Protein backbone atom coordinates (compact mmCIF):
# COMPACT_ATOMS: atom_id res chain seq x y z
CA UNK A 1 0.00 0.00 0.00
CA UNK A 2 2.92 2.37 0.72
CA UNK A 3 4.26 2.23 -2.84
CA UNK A 4 0.79 2.30 -4.33
CA UNK A 5 -0.11 5.53 -2.55
CA UNK A 6 2.85 7.53 -3.78
CA UNK A 7 1.87 9.56 -6.82
CA UNK A 8 -1.58 8.00 -7.18
CA UNK A 9 -3.34 8.97 -3.95
CA UNK A 10 -1.00 11.38 -2.18
CA UNK A 11 2.23 13.32 -2.35
CA UNK A 12 4.69 12.29 0.37
CA UNK A 13 7.84 14.05 1.50
CA UNK A 14 10.91 11.82 1.49
CA UNK A 15 12.47 13.32 4.61
CA UNK A 16 10.73 12.27 7.86
CA UNK A 17 9.47 14.95 10.23
CA UNK A 18 9.86 12.64 13.24
CA UNK A 19 11.57 9.33 13.97
CA UNK A 20 11.64 6.84 16.84
CA UNK A 21 12.87 3.33 17.52
CA UNK A 22 10.13 1.43 15.66
CA UNK A 23 8.69 3.94 13.19
CA UNK A 24 9.08 7.28 11.47
CA UNK A 25 6.60 9.92 10.34
CA UNK A 26 6.38 11.67 6.97
CA UNK A 27 4.20 14.59 5.94
CA UNK A 28 1.90 14.10 2.97
CA UNK A 29 -0.91 15.72 1.00
CA UNK A 30 -3.94 13.83 -0.30
CA UNK A 31 -5.42 14.40 -3.75
CA UNK A 32 -8.14 16.57 -2.18
CA UNK A 33 -5.50 18.82 -0.57
CA UNK A 34 -5.79 17.45 2.97
CA UNK A 35 -2.53 17.46 4.92
CA UNK A 36 -1.73 14.10 6.53
CA UNK A 37 0.90 12.49 8.73
CA UNK A 38 2.05 9.06 7.56
CA UNK A 39 3.61 6.83 10.20
CA UNK A 40 5.62 3.93 8.75
CA UNK A 41 7.19 1.02 10.61
CA UNK A 42 10.90 0.49 10.17
CA UNK A 43 11.84 -2.45 7.89
CA UNK A 44 12.05 -5.85 9.63
CA UNK A 45 11.20 -4.30 13.01
CA UNK A 46 9.19 -7.37 14.10
CA UNK A 47 12.12 -9.73 13.48
CA UNK A 48 14.44 -7.30 15.25
CA UNK A 49 12.23 -7.21 18.33
CA UNK A 50 11.93 -11.01 18.49
CA UNK A 51 15.72 -11.31 18.22
CA UNK A 52 16.29 -8.74 20.96
CA UNK A 53 13.80 -10.29 23.37
CA UNK A 54 15.26 -13.74 22.75
CA UNK A 55 18.65 -12.30 23.70
CA UNK A 56 17.23 -10.72 26.88
CA UNK A 57 15.63 -14.03 27.88
CA UNK A 58 19.01 -15.71 27.48
CA UNK A 59 20.64 -13.11 29.71
CA UNK A 60 17.92 -13.67 32.32
CA UNK A 61 18.57 -17.42 32.31
CA UNK A 62 22.25 -16.80 33.03
CA UNK A 63 21.53 -14.25 35.77
CA UNK A 64 18.97 -16.48 37.47
CA UNK A 65 21.35 -19.45 37.35
CA UNK A 66 24.06 -17.56 39.22
CA UNK A 67 21.91 -15.35 41.48
CA UNK A 68 18.83 -16.17 43.55
CA UNK A 69 18.24 -12.44 43.97
CA UNK A 70 17.77 -12.07 40.22
CA UNK A 71 15.28 -14.92 40.27
CA UNK A 72 13.23 -13.12 42.93
CA UNK A 73 13.00 -10.05 40.70
CA UNK A 74 10.97 -12.01 38.10
CA UNK A 75 12.97 -10.49 35.27
CA UNK A 76 11.41 -12.82 32.70
CA UNK A 77 7.93 -11.58 33.60
CA UNK A 78 9.08 -7.99 33.17
CA UNK A 79 10.53 -8.77 29.76
CA UNK A 80 7.38 -10.68 28.76
CA UNK A 81 5.23 -7.66 29.65
CA UNK A 82 7.49 -5.34 27.71
CA UNK A 83 7.53 -7.73 24.74
CA UNK A 84 3.72 -7.86 24.67
CA UNK A 85 3.48 -4.05 24.73
CA UNK A 86 6.12 -3.70 22.03
CA UNK A 87 4.33 -6.13 19.71
CA UNK A 88 1.12 -4.14 20.18
CA UNK A 89 3.03 -0.99 19.26
CA UNK A 90 4.06 -2.38 15.88
CA UNK A 91 0.46 -3.00 14.82
CA UNK A 92 -0.49 0.50 13.75
CA UNK A 93 -4.15 -0.48 13.42
CA UNK A 94 -4.27 -0.73 17.22
CA UNK A 95 -2.81 2.76 17.53
CA UNK A 96 -5.42 4.09 15.11
CA UNK A 97 -8.19 2.39 17.09
CA UNK A 98 -6.86 3.83 20.36
CA UNK A 99 -6.84 7.30 18.86
CA UNK A 100 -10.46 7.03 17.74
CA UNK A 101 -11.57 5.58 21.09
CA UNK A 102 -10.07 8.52 22.96
CA UNK A 103 -11.69 10.95 20.54
CA UNK A 104 -15.09 9.29 21.03
CA UNK A 105 -14.72 9.54 24.80
CA UNK A 106 -14.40 13.32 24.43
CA UNK A 107 -16.92 13.81 21.62
CA UNK A 108 -18.85 16.39 23.70
CA UNK A 109 -15.73 18.14 25.00
CA UNK A 110 -14.81 20.95 22.61
CA UNK A 111 -11.31 21.66 23.92
CA UNK A 112 -9.68 18.27 23.30
CA UNK A 113 -9.38 15.93 20.34
CA UNK A 114 -7.15 13.49 18.46
CA UNK A 115 -6.21 13.50 14.75
CA UNK A 116 -8.69 12.10 12.23
CA UNK A 117 -7.71 8.61 11.04
CA UNK A 118 -7.77 7.78 7.32
CA UNK A 119 -8.57 4.08 7.52
CA UNK A 120 -8.45 3.61 3.76
CA UNK A 121 -4.74 4.43 3.95
CA UNK A 122 -4.00 2.56 7.18
CA UNK A 123 -2.64 -0.98 7.62
CA UNK A 124 -0.67 -2.92 10.20
CA UNK A 125 2.53 -1.21 9.01
CA UNK A 126 1.18 2.16 7.88
CA UNK A 127 -0.91 4.75 9.72
CA UNK A 128 -2.32 7.80 7.96
CA UNK A 129 -3.87 10.53 10.09
CA UNK A 130 -4.72 14.21 9.94
CA UNK A 131 -1.64 16.44 10.11
CA UNK A 132 -1.81 18.72 13.12
CA UNK A 133 -0.80 22.33 12.53
CA UNK A 134 -0.11 23.42 16.06
CA UNK A 135 2.36 24.39 18.75
CA UNK A 136 3.88 21.98 21.25
CA UNK A 137 2.45 22.59 24.69
CA UNK A 138 5.90 23.42 26.09
CA UNK A 139 6.44 26.14 23.47
CA UNK A 140 3.98 28.56 25.05
CA UNK A 141 5.89 31.60 23.81
CA UNK A 142 4.76 30.69 20.28
CA UNK A 143 1.07 30.58 21.19
CA UNK A 144 -1.27 33.28 19.93
CA UNK A 145 -1.77 36.12 22.40
CA UNK A 146 -5.50 35.41 22.72
CA UNK A 147 -4.88 31.92 24.12
CA UNK A 148 -4.71 31.83 27.92
CA UNK A 149 -2.00 29.62 29.39
CA UNK A 150 -3.98 29.51 32.64
CA UNK A 151 -7.04 28.17 30.83
CA UNK A 152 -4.88 25.60 29.03
CA UNK A 153 -3.61 24.36 32.39
CA UNK A 154 -7.17 23.98 33.67
CA UNK A 155 -8.28 22.15 30.52
CA UNK A 156 -5.26 19.82 30.62
CA UNK A 157 -6.06 18.92 34.24
CA UNK A 158 -9.70 18.23 33.38
CA UNK A 159 -8.68 16.02 30.46
CA UNK A 160 -6.39 13.96 32.67
CA UNK A 161 -9.01 13.44 35.40
CA UNK A 162 -11.78 12.62 32.91
CA UNK A 163 -9.58 9.96 31.33
CA UNK A 164 -8.57 8.45 34.66
CA UNK A 165 -11.76 8.56 36.72
CA UNK A 166 -14.59 8.79 34.20
CA UNK A 167 -13.39 6.63 31.31
CA UNK A 168 -10.63 4.41 32.69
CA UNK A 169 -8.93 4.79 29.32
CA UNK A 170 -6.14 7.29 29.06
CA UNK A 171 -3.05 8.39 27.20
CA UNK A 172 -0.13 7.38 29.39
CA UNK A 173 2.60 9.11 27.39
CA UNK A 174 1.52 12.75 27.46
CA UNK A 175 4.96 14.31 27.26
CA UNK A 176 5.22 17.72 25.53
CA UNK A 177 6.11 16.17 22.17
CA UNK A 178 2.73 14.40 22.09
CA UNK A 179 0.55 17.38 23.01
CA UNK A 180 -0.19 20.23 20.61
CA UNK A 181 -2.29 23.39 20.76
CA UNK A 182 -4.02 24.36 17.52
CA UNK A 183 -4.87 27.89 16.38
CA UNK A 184 -8.21 27.89 18.20
CA UNK A 185 -6.67 26.82 21.50
CA UNK A 186 -7.81 23.19 21.38
CA UNK A 187 -5.50 20.55 22.87
CA UNK A 188 -4.64 17.78 20.39
CA UNK A 189 -2.96 14.56 21.55
CA UNK A 190 -0.95 12.33 19.21
CA UNK A 191 1.00 9.03 19.32
CA UNK A 192 -1.08 6.22 20.80
CA UNK A 193 1.19 3.21 20.35
CA UNK A 194 2.14 2.09 23.84
CA UNK A 195 0.26 4.76 25.65
CA UNK A 196 -3.36 3.73 26.11
CA UNK A 197 -4.00 2.28 29.55
CA UNK A 198 -7.25 0.65 30.64
CA UNK A 199 -8.36 0.95 34.26
CA UNK A 200 -11.20 -1.21 35.56
CA UNK A 201 -14.02 0.81 37.11
CA UNK A 202 -13.68 -0.52 40.70
CA UNK A 203 -10.01 0.51 40.88
CA UNK A 204 -10.23 3.96 39.25
CA UNK A 205 -10.43 5.90 42.55
CA UNK A 206 -7.07 4.41 43.57
CA UNK A 207 -5.13 5.68 40.53
List the predicted regions and their residue ranges:
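The start of beta-strands in P-loop NTPase/AAA+ ATPase cores
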Residues: 34, 125, 168-170, 177, ...
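Catalytic activation segment of kinase domains across protein kinase-like and atypical kinase folds
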Residues: 176-200, 204
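Feature representing long, continuous alpha-helical segments
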Residues: 126, 135, 150, 154-158, ...
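Conserved ATP-binding subdomain of kinase catalytic cores across diverse folds
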Residues: 8-9, 13-135
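AlphaC helix of the protein kinase catalytic domain
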Residues: 137-145
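Conserved kinase catalytic-core segment
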Residues: 147-182, 192
Amino acid sequence: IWKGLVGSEMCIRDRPIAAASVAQVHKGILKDGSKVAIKVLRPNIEQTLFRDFKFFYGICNVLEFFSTNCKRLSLKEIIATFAHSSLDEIDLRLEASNSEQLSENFVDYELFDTPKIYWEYTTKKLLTSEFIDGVRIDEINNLKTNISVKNLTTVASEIFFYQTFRDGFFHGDLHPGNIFINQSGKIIAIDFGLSLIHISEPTRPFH
